[in-house]
Amino acid sequence: DYTRTWEFYCSKGQNSGKWKSIEVPSCWELQGFGEYTYGRYYTIKGAKPSDETGIYRYRFLTPDCGKNDRIKLFFDGVMTDAEVRVNGNPAGQIHQGAFYRFSYDITSLLKAEGENLLEVKVAKQSANKSVNAAERRADWWLYGGIYRPVWLEVVPDVSMEHFILDARADGSLRASVRMAGNAEGHVLAVSIRGLKDGKPLRTLQGKEQVSCPLATSGRETGFTCKWSDVKVWNIEAPELYVARLELKDRSGNVIQVREERIGFRTIEFFPQDGIYLNGTRLIVKGINRHSFSVDGGRTTSAAMSRQDALLIKEMNMNAVRSHYPPDEHFLDMCDSLGLVYIDELSGWHGRYDTETGARLIREMVERDVNHPSVILWSNGNEGGWNTDNDSLFCKYDKFQRRHVIHPWADFDGLDTHHYPAYLTGVARFTNGYKVFMPTEFMHAMYDQGGGAGLRDFWDRWMTNPMFAGGFIWVFCDEAPKRSDRGGVLDSDGSNAPDGVVGPRREKEGSFYAIRSQWSPVQIKPLLITEHFDGSFFVSNEYIYTNLKDCRMTYEVLSCDIPMQGAVSRILARGEVTLPALSPGETGKARFSLPASFAEGDVLKLEAFDRDGHCICDWSFPIRLANPYFQRHLAQVSTGLSGNTVSARNNGKEIVLKSEKVSVTFDAATGMILRVLSGNTEIPLTNGPVAVGMKMLYQPASSYVRQDSEEAVFCARYKGGADSIVWRLT
C-alpha cells in the first residue's frame, strides 16, 4: 500500500487557496480539490479546460544505506507537469507526460540527519502544447495530481540500472544489462525458478545459475543461455517464471538482487499472414480499457486490476488495449492470467513533438519491455502518432523488436481500421490482402455495440485467414463520483465511455452476449425432440487447448411457470463426455439420458476450462411452449386460487398489487416508479419509453379497474401507440 497523507495546496476550484491534507496517490478532484473538466471541452464554444496547479509537501527521513549507496526517487505517474524539489533544491528537469514512470537520483540532496522535505509542483495543463494535444484534448476525463505511487530505492554505487530479458519459447534467454558505476571486475549471476512451484530451471549443461563478467561503467553487457524443460507462456496456459539477477562485487559478495517475472514465449508478425504466438496464429478477442475507478478517477489498485482482468477473462477475451501505458500492476495481471496487451504511447488525436515523444517512448518501453503479455507497441491513436519516432520502439526493445502499429491506420502490413462497416471497403478486410485487426469496433454506447451484432461481424471476418482479431470499445462506464456535486456519478452526458460493465463493474447485457459468442467451446444448434439420445455437436475454438482438457456437465431442470414464483428444481445432473478435439475441430459430445429426462423442462449444459473455471453455459428447452403451457396449466389455476389483487389511483400514484407483487406507476406520466416482489425491489423503473416514435400519455382517458381475478391499469396514448394494458393476476 503506497498511500500516504501529504500536505497540499490547490490554486483554483474546490478547497483552493489554503494548505490542507491529501492522500497520495490520488487525482486531486476526487479528493475534493480543483475543478472537473471533460476532455471534449473544445466542442463547446469558448470553453477552456481547468488549469489549476497543485503543490505537494512530504517530510521523510533518509533511509538507512551504505556510504557509497545511491538513493533514487521514483514517480509512477503525475498529471501533468511535475517540478520536483528536495530540501529546496531541484531534483532534476521538470517532467512532462502523465502516464510514464520517471526518477531522480537525490543522494546529494538529502540530509544525513533530520527530516527531508519533498516538494512537488504539479501543473494540470502542461507548458508543452504537444503534451496537451496528445493527452488533454481527448475523449476522457482530465484529472490532475500525483495519481500513481511514489517511492524511494536504495542502490549500491555499482548497480544494475536497467535490464532486458528476452525469454523465448525454445528455452533460450537473451539478456542485456545496463550498469551504473564502475562495474569492472563485477559478476552478474542469473537463475530462474518456477513462480508456482519454486523449482529451479537448469541450463542444457545442467547448471542452475549462469554467471557473466560485466563491462565498465555506462555500458551494456549482453549474454545468452538456454534452459531445459521450459513450459511456454501462452494465453491459455500462462506459465510464469522468476528470473533472479545477482550482482556480485570483486570479492564475490552479493551487493544487489533484482527479480523479474518472465514468460518463455515467442511473438512474431508476418505480413500477409498474421500474428503468431509460439508458432501458432493468434486471433485476439480483445477490449479497450482505461485505468478508471469511480472513487479514484485515474488512480486504481492491484485489487482493481485483478478484478478487471478476471472480468475480461470471464467474457472469454484474451487481449486488452488502452490509450496509454496502464498501471504496471494491470500488466502483471495480464501476465498471470493470460491476456495479451497492446502497449500504447498516448496520443488521442494529437501527437507529442519529436523530442518529447522520444523521451516518453523510452520511459514506456523500458518499464514494460519484459512483460510477456505485451505483444505489440502502439504509437498513438487515430492520427496521434509521430512517425519520426516509429523506429525508437525497436531501439529500446532491441531483442524482440515487437511490431509497431498506428491504430485506425493501415500501416506496415497491419490494417487496424476503426469501426468498420460489415462490408468495409474495396481491397480491405475480407476483401483485402493484408492482415487486419480493428483496434476499435463494436462501440458499446447504449449497448448498440458490444455483444450486439458481434456474431455477424466476427463470423464474416473469420472467413479470411488474415483476420487477426479485434478490440471492442469499451470495457467500463467512466463516471467518477463528483466531490463537488454531492457524490453524483457523472458521465458528462453521453460523452464519457459507455462500456460493457458499469462504473462499479456491474455486468450489463453485452457482458453475457460477448461471453457466449466468444466462448472457446461452442455448441452447434440443438433442438431436443423425442429422438434426442444425449449426443450433440461441439466445436473447439481454443487456440492451444485440446477439448479433452475441459469438462462439461448437464442438469435436467423442472421449471414451474413464472407466475408460481418458484425456483427451478434439478431432476438429474451428471458429466458430459467431451471428444478429444484439437483447436478448430468439431465432434460429438454425449451423455446418458437419465430416467427423469422426459419429466424435465430444460436441459442446462455448462463447460469448464482446465482450471475449473466456468467458460459458458447454455439452456435448451426439452419441450416447446405449447406442451409446456398445457402441462403447467393446472398448476397455474391451483396457484392462483385465493389470490387477492387490488388497483388504486390516488392522483399521484397508480398501484397494482397482489399478495406477492406490487407495481407503482406515476399517475402524471404513466411510467413505472418501482416494482416490489415481496420486500425486494426489482430494478425496473422509468419506462416504458418510446423508441423511434412519439407517444403522448393521456391521463384523462387512462383508467384502473379490478375484479376477483385481476387488477388492470390501461394507459392511453396519442401517437405511435393507442394504449398499453398492465394486468396483474
Language-model region placement:
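Substrate-binding clefts and catalytic carboxylate motifs of secreted carbohydrate-active enzymes
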Residues: 6-14, 23, 29-31, 78, ...
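Beta-strand-rich binding/interaction modules
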Residues: 86, 172-210, 533-577, 589-590, ...
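Accessory carbohydrate-binding/adhesion or oligomerization-edge regions at the termini
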Residues: 1-40, 121-130, 195-197, 201, ...
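Accessory beta-strand-rich segments of carbohydrate-active enzymes
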Residues: 10-13, 27, 31, 51-160, ...
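Extended acidic/polar, glycine-enriched regions
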Residues: 111-115, 178-270, 597, 604, ...
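Active-site-adjacent substrate/metal-binding segments within catalytic domains
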Residues: 31-62, 66-75, 79-86, 92-93, ...
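Acidic-aromatic substrate-binding/catalytic surfaces of carbohydrate-active enzymes
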Residues: 4-41, 617, 651-727
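Substrate-binding/catalytic cleft of secreted carbohydrate-active enzymes
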Residues: 303, 309-312, 319-505, 509, ...
